[in-house]
Amino acid sequence: MSPLSIISRRPQPQFRRRQPRHIEFLGLPFSLLQQVEVIRLITEQGGAPYRYIVTPNAYHVVTVHDEPKWLLPVYRAAWLSLCDSRIVRALARFDRLPLPLVTGSDLIAALLATLNATDRNHTPRRILVIGPQRAVEGVLRAVYPNLTIDVMPAPGALGQSADMRRAVARACMNRTWDIALLCVGCPAQELIAQQLGELGCKSGIALCVGASIDFLTGASSRAPLWTQKAGLEWAYRLSREPRRLWRRYLIESPRIFRIFMTERALRGR
């Protein structure tokens, strides 16, 4: 039995928080919500206690399996856990599980557009973007003029430095925001989201959404739609950034198939 399978069955009272409808798959919780439902929930959370959203893909699943004691509680503490991978969804379908696909990039584009439209005659929603270069701030403000946009660049290699992650979390605490978009990669963004709660963040929603803002602003090119639908977005991204992504897509992420088969064997399927 895998370490993650054992840990996932233990109670996590200090981290666990009730989520809207969810299932367990590959050792992680996944919310059974469509994108439109997620946006509705987010927009209805004004004044609610602080909470965060994770968007696990194949790489996230593998990363959590590598460090279950460290990372699994972080994903379990999330308010929502949205499937951001067509490969993960395909594996779920193979197991006859109705797992919706809600990619971080599509979610953020739709969420900001919705907030921009609904905030036209109300107090503008304050959006803090952590990670990208400050140059994207002007682009976002031009596209979403009815939102208050604040971009906070973050250093690289946050995944290897607990001190740097805590410094970023403290910097977020010193800003005023309703929604924070954490765009610093897995697992740094999820750990920072959890740290915000530990530091006493009272309200707001943090979304862990990787490179979504880079795609949205054109800083990075997203795969053509047909490539996305074919489940080959990873190949497109690899072709664009081979030095940075070759290990993730060719060595680490494919391990999800072994994880899937191990989980099926444990369930007796």
Language model segments and positions:
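N-terminal nucleotide/polyanion-binding subdomain common to many enzyme families
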Residues: 2-112
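A transmembrane-helix-recognition feature enriched in membrane-embedded lipid enzymes
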Residues: 89-90, 222-269
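Conserved beta-alpha
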Residues: 88-176
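Short glycine-rich anion-binding loops that position phosphate/pyrophosphate groups of nucleotides
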Residues: 57-60, 184-189, 212-213
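A contiguous pocket-lining binding segment that forms or flanks enzyme active sites
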Residues: 164-203
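A short helix->loop->beta-strand "cap" motif at the edges of active sites that frequently abuts
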Residues: 50, 122-125, 201-205
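Structural motif
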Residues: 53-55, 82, 128, 179-183, ...
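Short, flexible loop segments at boundaries between secondary-structure elements
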Residues: 154-160, 202-240
